């Protein structure tokens, strides 16, 4: 599976176990539960072979389970390596209760690049299925070995086919998203359609699982219901994210600038600054100092004026006390508000300086002002 923000509660408390091609590799505590269950199931099946005795079936069951999850990791690496080739950072690969997850920093730039990333995982699983099938049919192996190879081959086939279901958050949903994106030219429409299809499959899985538990259908179990719930939750999350993105893309950074941002002109003396901007005025403790051309010159903290005797305030100007803000990140006033919000989140910033293309300061922007902008537009 692929994700920009997938996982929810299942992705908490991950344990880092190393790196793969420079990609951080994690396992979620829920993975150990499924590892134990799979080992138990495979061990019981292998214990039926008379050639295997004692603890051998259980050791082979554990090895088979680990090879199964190695197949899942290979599937996720397929996504990840194609994404890396497109210059997209892969933040992590995680094994968890429902399989594996490759977490990408951002979307691909084009529909066909998105298609390539999405299809790479199932393609790897299909290649593994073909390779294991050839090994199992062409190379003489003990019967238990043939059973293990055959099982791994079929699991990889099932992994590919299940992930090709055309609904988010599955790979098939990302394939559908890229196709709709290519046809309509609208990425959000692709996400919304693939999310709705994913929700439909989620409800279908829940229905099948419920009917199976009631013995109305010969298939379906509690596990089917759990998978359906997972699909519903994450498809719904994808749809909501797409709607928020669509709303935010209608605005620019300038639209979300804080009204009356703390901007003061160079040449202002400390007495004027204190009277007009500080004493009984605003809660700001840091001000942007701009020149006659409205370009940023520096930043003045209110704490700095305490070092100047009050008798000297009329003679000392703010630009003589200011410091240049080396760490302040700027964005273009015309930049999409969605891109700006992503920058705030990715770099863990509290605020951004918004400037015109010519460099003129517009004001400050922060998460609260983005939320207020969206709420005002929705009212």
UniProtKB/Swiss-Prot annotation:
Q: How does it sit in the membrane?
A: Multi-pass membrane protein
Q: What is its EC number?
A: 3.4.24.-
Q: Can you tell me which family this protein belongs to? A: Belongs to the peptidase M50B family.
Lineage, top-rank taxon, reads Bacteria
What keywords sit in the KW lines?
CBS domain, Cell membrane, Hydrolase, Membrane, Metal-binding, Metalloprotease, Protease, Repeat, Transmembrane, Transmembrane helix, Zinc
What detail does the entry give on cofactor binding? Answer: Binds 1 zinc ion per subunit.
User: Entry's PANTHER family?
Assistant: MEMBRANE-ASSOCIATED ZINC METALLOPROTEASE M50B (PTHR39188), STAGE IV SPORULATION PROTEIN FB (PTHR39188:SF3)
Domain CBS: residue ranges: 257-315, 322-379
Gene3D superfamilies assigned to the protein according to its UniProt record, in alphabetical order: CBS-domain
Q: What is this protein called?
A: Putative zinc metalloprotease sll0528
Q: Which GO terms describe its molecular function?
A: metal ion binding; metallopeptidase activity
